[in-house]
Amino acid sequence: VAPAATLLPIKVFSGGTAASSAVTAGLDYAIASNARVINLSLGATSPTGDTGLRRVAATNNAVVVIAAGNDSTASPNWPSRYAKEAWANGTLISVGAVDVNKRLHTYSNKAGDIAPFYLVAPGVSIISSYGSSYAHMTGTSMAAPAVAGAAALVTGYWPYLRANQVSAILLTTADDLGAPGVDAIYGRGMLNVNRALAPIGSYTYRTITGAITRISLSTPGVVSYQPSVSSPSAFANVNTEVFDDYGRNYSSAEGAALAVRTALTVDGVLGRMDRLLDTSEQVLADGSTLLRLNSRAPDSKTQRATSPSQSLVSYQSAAGLSFSAGDGGLSSMTLGLMGSSWGHRLAGLDPILGNPLSNFAPEHRFASLGLPLVAGWQARAATLQSTRHRAASGDITLMEMGHVGARHAINVSTGDLSETGLLGGYSNSALGLNQATHSQGVTISGAYLVAPNWALAASYSQTRTAAPRASGMLTHATDIEANAYGVGVVRSDWLKTGDRLSLTVHTPLSARSGHLTYSVVQSVDETGSPQFGTQEVTLRPHAREWRTEARYTMPVRQWGGNLSAALSTRLHADNDEQAALQWVMGVRYQLTF
């Protein structure tokens, strides 16, 4: 069980018996030799050995594992019975024997009134030394060494534990047998070494400032992401020692849990096209327009359409007053230049024209109101509310000012992001990425009509995130600045009337500055006390992601459908300079009926 343990055989028997004085002398020798685990595969029908056991218990340095006896009695014999005494201080464990089917052996003494301090372990047909050879032996004297070995294993990993802590770990992690809970036959149940080595209760994170964060091991985990403006490698070196309810240290690669990489998908590339194709526009009698969209995602098992997962309604009066609302993250279709009278001309360029802050609420409901001003200017206010839970989520307020001329369109969008998370990053409370943060940004976008059917567009965004407060292991942070930009061109009526070709090149929001400082436990000393260090996280990546997209759609009027094709690539995906080039190409035909 504990192959690296050092064994110290101590003889207390003379012939077939052991005097109480011999047992006491043996225990005293074990104490003097600094033994951490003592196995007593012996027993008596009357009190014996308590003098030495009292001295061992007083040191709280050695776990004493004692065979329960083989008399088929309702309770263990001596000295195993001492385990329940107050002076034993929880350092003594009584052990019964079970067979391969986890049934108490006929001769094994039961737990009885020692049940809270009683375990069972394999003790039937155990190979043991016998004279100058080996033999299969049965009894509680065979079961006790298995528990002693487990105690040695726990002590070896965490030598700073006190004896009663080691005993408690073995007792509380036993597999329940017999009647539910602690019972008079099996006591605590069957020894489980794996559970004894695993953390118990909660993880405690400690910092040099004295801050403590506890996370229950029964708490459902969260999906962790690094901030999307950074790279998967940014947090790679954030490792720390964490402590369970018994103070045992475990190495935790906190940063590795954040190394999330995303991938292009055909649905992600073609899905936006299909949303555009699902849109219906109606011109009302007074000249106002009503835009409606209901998009259904197919069920992953049946591939049948489900209830609408995305919806949008947009109304624009003849005088220019507009109102839009929707669910499912479709705000980009009605905001910025896409929400202007040039929106139909710029279809396909939406990846570069939106305010990138809205990407931090990918699943949201929204409402917007647009007011016409003078000389082609329009103002718009919008609010986006995230519908995510236990993940990075943000509520966003946007204020926009736009102008549309005969050959040009411009839009300035300012955004205010109140986020639970950090720029798309999220984790448990230890890394401080599940707190409330605040970001502001501005996006300037413009489009120019090069020719009647050709439009060129470009955008630039700059954001600033206030330094996150100290939380969990996070002890210091700076403000975070990031930017994004892109260009695109779209041609309509290229090969046939009603078709559209668009090309875009852009780089998503990427950090230009920002640091996070974490206090970590690098190791523990011989007493189990944490030895602290720091880990610095630089959010600015070594490379930044570039995305290119080519899209083509055309109506197939004779069949009442639409043909869509797209090619999309990602260079340095997730701002990772080591990431392989990603590309997706897809073709889809959609028939409306």
Model-identified regions with their sequence ranges:
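Substrate-binding/access-modulating region of protease and related hydrolase catalytic domains
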Residues: P9-N89, S128-A144
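Outer membrane beta-barrel transmembrane domains
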Residues: T334-M338, W342-P356, R380, N411-A436, ...
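Extracellular S/T/G-rich loop segment that most often corresponds to the catalytic His/Ser-adjacent loop
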Residues: R81-G156, Y160
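Residues on the lipid-exposed face of transmembrane beta-strands in outer-membrane beta-barrel proteins
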Residues: S311-Y315, A367-L371, M399-H403, V442-Y448, ...
